[in-house]
């Protein structure tokens, strides 16, 4: 295989982090007060970057969190990159022009596990299909749809133990299921976690307290 040309453009992104006075008062007595503030800012920015990674679709000159609460207009995220640069590996529908994938008896797939197996078989090159680092990144709702029927009933102790084992493993299509913050609730992404990267310029962070 060959490497594709791909350029990157560094643009300024401003992150706002708010801490309530009540929280600051609670932390004020600790010797690591400044470190706590620093860590809170770093965590908030990291979660924002993850939100952009899953939901970002464009780069606006001035973002608007009111109309784009998931930071869709801050930058193009990983999923948007797939849609625009690797559309052949994106499954948006099974029936042409339906705009949806249906799961259940007599529908596109009998269950979500079959969908994941199909994704691996159809969209991932054969030499990567056996990669033991592949995972399924998914939204909370899809995991709930699979596991809620297992736990939402009265069970004998032996069945409870079996249910605990099944739900603790969290697998879809025999791949580990990974829940991450801000992922689209009804979406799936089969990949290696080290495929996901965020690039920023070294020594380019600036912080201003208001």
Where do the model's predicted regions map?
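Sequence/fold signature of self-assembling virion shell proteins
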Residues: 72-118, 132-135, 141-210
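Generic recognition of flexible, low-complexity loop/linker segments
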Residues: 121-126, 165
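Long, contiguous amphipathic alpha-helices that act as assembly "spine/axial" helices in icosahedral shell
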Residues: 3-89, 125-143, 177, 210
């Amino acid at each position: 295989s060959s490497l594709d040309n791909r350029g990157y453009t560094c643009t300024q992104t401003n992150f706002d982090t708010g801490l309530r006075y009540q929280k600051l008062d609670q932390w004020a007595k600790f010797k690591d007060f400044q470190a706590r503030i620093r860590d809170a800012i770093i965590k908030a920015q990291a979660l924002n970057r993850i939100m952009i990674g899953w939901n970002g679709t464009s780069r606006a000159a001035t973002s608007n969190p009111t109309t784009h609460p998931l930071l869709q207009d801050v930058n193009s995220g990983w999923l948007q990159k797939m849609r625009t640069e690797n559309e052949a590996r994106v499954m948006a529908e099974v029936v042409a022009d339906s705009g949806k994938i249906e799961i259940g008896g007599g529908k596109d797939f009998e269950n979500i596990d079959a969908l994941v197996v199909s994704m691996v078989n159809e969209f991932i090159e054969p030499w990567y299909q056996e990669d033991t680092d592949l995972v399924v990144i998914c939204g909370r709702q899809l995991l709930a749809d699979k596991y809620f029927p297992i736990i939402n009933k009265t069970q004998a102790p032996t069945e409870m133990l079996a249910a605990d084992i099944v739900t603790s493993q969290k697998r879809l299509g025999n791949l580990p299921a990974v829940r991450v913050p801000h992922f689209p609730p009804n979406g799936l992404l089969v990949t290696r976690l080290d495929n996901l990267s965020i690039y920023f310029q070294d020594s380019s962070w600036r912080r201003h307290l208001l």
